Amino acid sequence: MSLFSAQNRVPLTVPGGVAAQPSIQVDSNLRRWFSRNLGLWRSRRQYTFSDDQVLHLDMNLKMEAFAHPEVGESRYRFSWWSDQEDQHSDEFFARKPWFERSGVMEATLWGHQLQRSRGYLTGDPVRTRLRQVDEHETILESHYQQWDILEHIRLVDQDRYRYRAIYSWENGDLSIVEHHHEIRMSDPL
């Protein structure tokens, strides 16, 4: 059985059809790992597509924590944007118009899952499974629409740098491989 078969998909509804939010205690290690990612980051990216096309892109990322989340929750806002004057950005978005030049996503940490208000490749809500490799690395696994996405995020050198490797399968075929080298520009306030 494939890791990305339909049986491994995470449902967007609470099992049993219950509409209420589940009462889950957030893992303190994951909460700590997410707090280490707060702040402004400069992201230098390489995308390799299934047609062997390789494109580069520079982005800015900002991760913030909500000041007053509900009891037992950890909530975050992720914002991303590219510099308007960047030649690589113009070329990238002209060739791949389904990617967004800027956007905002909100997310809630529930145990070992992250409920996102949207995905990077869709505007629909997405539930992501989290696995912590060690205190510096977490793996995110998402399934939505025709996409299966595996993302490795590793904090490096006292959290001054971050490396992300993202593999995206479309309808079971590896379609996009991304490598992001990120530099912390500012710590959270």
Description of each model-found segment:
Residues 2-22, 85-189:
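Calycin-type beta-barrel ligand-binding domains and close structural analogs
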Residues 1-102, 184-189:
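Amphipathic/hydrophobic helical signal segments and adjacent flexible N-terminal regions
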